[in-house]
Amino acid sequence: EYKGNVFNDIGKKWMLITAAKDGKVNTMTASWGNMGVMWGKDIVSVFIRQTRFTKEFVDNADCFSISFLDHEKYAKELSYLGTVSGRDEDKINKANLHVEFSGDVPYIEEADDVMICKKMFRQTMEPDAFIDKEALEKWYSDKNYHDMYMASIEHILEKK
C-alpha cells in the first residue's frame, strides 16, 4: 500500500522511471503522472516523450520501476537525470546512484519508495485528441508528443 501524497511525490519531489534493455539500465526524471484504478487494478500512468532514450527501454520491457527519492537530498541528481541522456553517458553512475533489482526489474537503490510496474496500455498523445488547445500549443509546439503508459503496480518496496 502506497502511503505517500501522489500530488506532492510526482509533481514536486519527482520520480525516476527505470527500465532495462539488452543488459543495460536507463532512468529518467519525470514529474507528470497519475495513480488510480483501472480494470480493477491499482495503476500508475507515466508520460514519456517519444524522443527520450528511456522510452526505448520501457518499450522493450514488460515491467519498469518508479523510484521516489528524497528531493531535498537528491535534487541535484534528479535534475541531472532529467536533462542528460543515457545515450551520451552512464548517467546513473555519474549521478552517484546505484541500481538494484526486484526480479529482473531495475530500480534506484537510494529511493525511499519504489513501485514495480507491469505495462498494461500505451498510447501516443495525438493532436486531435486535445480538447485544451492551449495545452497543445504550450507543451507540444515542437510536436514532440508523449506516450502514456498505464501499468499495474505489482508491488511496492519501502525503505525501512
Predicted regions and their residues:
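Basic, polyanion-binding surface patches
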Residues: 1-160
